[in-house]
Each structure stands twice: as structure tokens, then as C-alpha cells.
A protein has these predicted regions:
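Carbohydrate-interacting/catalytic domains
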Residues: 110-111, 123-130, 134-296
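Conserved alpha/beta catalytic core and glycan-binding cleft of carbohydrate-active enzymes
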Residues: 1-143, 171, 177, 181, ...
Length: 296
């Protein structure tokens, strides 16, 4: 696995590298979408925050460099040794330690946006990779400031617990690890995508607006029966996160949901729901691995 800037396609022919640090088809699109920041904190663009069209365009275009095996093990990082910490990017401060000072990296950060990013990291195709300290709330500008020591005794315990729960969700749901990906709804600052295989589906809903949003979402296109119940298994908001489970009905192939302000929802339709639903139809969707489908 290599660190590479630019299109890696010539290196991913099966004879050289297995995969790369996934800047172009993960770190950069998610950073622009959620924070409007360049990954070194060298630029801020208001027009990129919540720009779902730019997000999907970048993701799909850059994913074409990967074969499925390379995509499945691509190192999906939010931060690393060469770039500012993702949590620092949430404060929209343009600069580095030599211009702003290290203290500025910790100022006005938005942990709710960080939680959104971790939810996406743990549910996106590839290998979620945590840069040491991200899970504990470490901040920092581009190196060397991003290489701060681990904050022993001063960790953000809620952020650590968030990572633990999301890692468990990643491990326990095969459709998240190696299923297909499809975007099923987009709006300004609102993104809904599905990870699915022939038997199970997980929906991830992201709202980067500072207020809750309620939307009707078509879900039948990813193999979810038109009359069934989804289980909300995880959520985040401006205060933290919740693992409380609630039922969300699907009527005529659509669900109505309210996504918290600067928050996320993860919803699941699995074997248990299909078995309990007398009206469940056999899914017509085949498992097309690394199937980057946008919107029908």
C-alpha cells in the first residue's frame, strides 16, 4: 500500500501496489463536503460545503482508478501525518502553525461535523483507517503540528466511544464491508446513500445543515421491500450520539425521516426484518461489487 498523489491507475494493475492512501476518492471529497476546507487547511471554499453534486462527481470520477480489490482495501483516512487533523478543519481556519500558532488549531472546532465524518468513514467502501489520536479528539495543523502526542488522561471519551460503536457496526454488517454503494438522495447539505447486497441493506443519512431536515426517501431501488420496517441503529447530533433503536416504516417504497441538525442516521433492513415481513419481495438487485451508482 502506497502514499501517492495523483491518479494511481498505472500502479494498480495487480503487479505493483495493492492500493493507496485514498486521498482523491475519500479524504478530499468528504473534507470539502463537510468542511469546505482543503486537506492541508490551506484554503476554504464556502461553495463546497454541502455541495452534494461536487461530492458525488469527485467520488465517482476518482473511483474509476480503482479495481474492486484495490478499492476494498484503500486506506480511507480523515487525517494523517501529512495533513491537518480533520477536527481542526471543522473550524474553517486557513493557515498553518507558522502563521496562526498551534493554539488556533484547537479553537472553534465542531465535533458534530467530526462525528458526521466518522460515520461516513466507517460506512464507505474501503478500509477505514484511524490516524492515531483522531479517536481521542486530537487537533493540529499540517505537519509537524498534526503529529502531537496522544492526550493520555485528557482523551475525549465520547469520541472514543463513538469510534468503538461505529467500528462494531462496520464489522457486524457484511453489506458495509463489501457490498454495493448507491446514492439514493441528495439535496443541499443532505446526503443519503445505501450499502447493500442481495440480503441486507444499510442506509446512511447525513445532514450537514445547522437545523433538522425531514425528507421522503425512495428506498425500494436497493432491494428494500416496498412495505416493511427499517431499524434505526445509530444516530448522531450536535450533542453526541445514540445507539437507541427505533422503527422507521416504509410505505409504497418510501420512508420519511428527520435527520438531526449536523447529524446522521444509520438504518438497517436485514434478514430478521425480511423474515418477519409477510409482504417482503425477493430482491431483484444483484450484488454488484464497487457498484458506484449515483441516482436513477
Amino acid at each position: 500500500l502506497a502514499e501517492h498523489y495523483g491518479n494511481p491507475v498505472s500502479w494498480l494493475d495487480g503487479k505493483q501496489w495493492d492500493s493507496v492512501m485514498n486521498y482523491d476518492a475519500f479524504m478530499e471529497p468528504i473534507t470539502w463536503f463537510l468542511t469546505g476546507m482543503e486537506k492541508h487547511s490551506d484554503d476554504f471554499r464556502q461553495d463546497m460545503i454541502g455541495n452534494t453534486s461536487a461530492f458525488w462527481g469527485s467520488m465517482i470520477y476518482n473511483a474509476t482508478a480503482f479495481s474492486y480489490p484495490s478499492a476494498a482495501v484503500a486506506m480511507n483516512e480523515l487525517s494523517n501525518h501529512d495533513h491537518s487533523r480533520f477536527l481542526t478543519r471543522t473550524n474553517h481556519k486557513v493557515g498553518r502553525t507558522n502563521t496562526l500558532g498551534p493554539e488556533a488549531a484547537d479553537e472553534d472546532v465542531n465535533k458534530a461535523v467530526m462525528r458526521e465524518a466518522v460515520v461516513m468513514q466507517m460506512t464507505w467502501p474501503g478500509a477505514p483507517t484511524i490516524y492515531n489520536g483522531d479517536e481521542a479528539g486530537v487537533c493540529g495543523f499540517t505537519d509537524p503540528d498534526n503529529r502531537r502526542t496522544y492526550p493520555w488522561g485528557h482523551e475525549d471519551r465520547q469520541m472514543i466511544d463513538l469510534h468503538k460503536h461505529l467500528i462494531r457496526i462496520h464489522k457486524e454488517n457484511p453489506e458495509i464491508r463489501d457490498g454495493s454503494l448507491r446514492g439514493i438522495f441528495e439535496d443541499y447539505n443532505v446526503l443519503v446513500y445505501a450499502r447493500f447486497n442481495t440480503e441486507e441493506q444499510t442506509l446512511v443519512c447525513v445532514n450537514n445543515n445547522p437545523q433538522p431536515v425531514t425528507r421522503q426517501i425512495k428506498v425500494w431501488e436497493v432491494g428494500i421491500p416496498k412495505e416493511t420496517v427499517l431499524i434505526q441503529i445509530f444516530s448522531t447530533d450536535e450533542q453526541g450520539f445514540s445507539t437507541e433503536q427505533t422503527e422507521v416504516p416504509v410505505v409504497a417504497g418510501k420512508m420519511e425521516i428527520t435527520i438531526p441538525a449536523t447529524g446522521t442516521l444509520i438504518l438497517k433492513h436485514g434478514k430478521a426484518q425480511a423474515e418477519d415481513d409477510e409482504k417482503a419481495e425477493k430482491s431483484p438487485i444483484r450484488n454488484r461489487r464497487w457498484n458506484f451508482v449515483k441516482f436513477s
